[in-house]
Structures are given as C-alpha cells and as structure tokens.
Amino acid sequence: LKKDLDQVIALLAEELRNPLFDAKEFENLKQQFIGNTQQDLNDPGERGSIALSQAIYPKGNPNYSLSVEDNIANIKNATLDEVKAFHKKYFGTASMRLVIVGDTDGANLNASLKKSFKNWNGGVTEKLKFEEASKAAAKTELVTIPEKPSAELFVGQFTGLKRADADYIPFYIGNYTLGAGFAGRLMQ
C-alpha cells in the first residue's frame, strides 16, 4: 500500500464521488441481500437478537431491529433512485470519516487525501432525533424455529444509560467482558 498510496487514494476518491449505480448490478445485489437475509429466519442468534432489541427499544430508536420479514420487504422495495438520492445528500467530506490502518506515513497520507478529495464538498451531518428507550415491564418471549436443534438465550435490561453518559463506556466494556458472547467470563 505504501508505494501505491497515491493511486489507491485517488481510486477510492473517484469511486466515492462518482459511483456507477449500474441498474443490473443493483438488482443483483438486492437478490443477494434478500438471500442472505432469508438465512436469518433459521438463525437462533439473529432471531434472538432481534427479539431482544424489539423488547428493549421503541421503533423510533436506532437500536431497534426490524424483523427479518420487514428487512426483506425493505430490500425488495428499495429503488436505485433512492440510493442515488441518498448518495447525493449524505456522501461527501462534510460527513465522511475515513480510517486507514497499515504501514502508511501520516504526512504522505494526509497530502494524498487532500489532493484526491479537494473540491469535494457535500455530505450533510444531521443531528439524529429518536425515541429513547424507557423502562418496560419484565417480559419473556419465545421465538420458535421449527426443527432447529439448537437454542440460544438472550437476557437484556433497560439501564437508562445514554451514549453521552460518563458511565456508558465502562458499562459497555463490563457488559462485554462478563457476558457478551462466548468470550465472556460468564461463559467460561
């Protein structure tokens, strides 16, 4: 990457600024996404995660997960014109965050980025407004997947913490360390 950095960054900038938006490729990708999403119908982990997020978060919250069926419907209904409009509104240096990891030189990288992305304005940043989660009554939900020999257990609780709260990051790390996945200490 180091020796080809200018060329790689220039190609990246070109692809981000001027994507092809090929109609046939768009339809192929939609079918691929639908196929991948349909597999979630038989995935206990995915179905459990969706059920838990729906139990904790209201529909207007970004942490709320749509059902697999709703995701498939959204993919089917998506249009290339909507994708083009989204790109036009949101893509640009005003809202872009670029992370490059590897054997690179910061000064050369910065110069290459400035050269390749100069004169590209646009991209809006919007303050997201969404419905906050609130405490709800305890609930047990069973998600049945016929003929599935495995089962998964999901446990969640409303904490009232918001991302901006000082305790959010320590709580997040503690939660992950104790029980988020098979690496968690509660699974040992």
Residue ranges of predicted features:
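Phosphate-proximal small/polar/acidic motifs at interfaces that engage nucleotide phosphates
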Residues: 187-188
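His/Glu-based metal-binding/catalytic segments typifying zinc-dependent metallopeptidases
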Residues: 125-184
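Charge-rich, well-structured scaffold segments of protease-associated domains
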Residues: 1-125
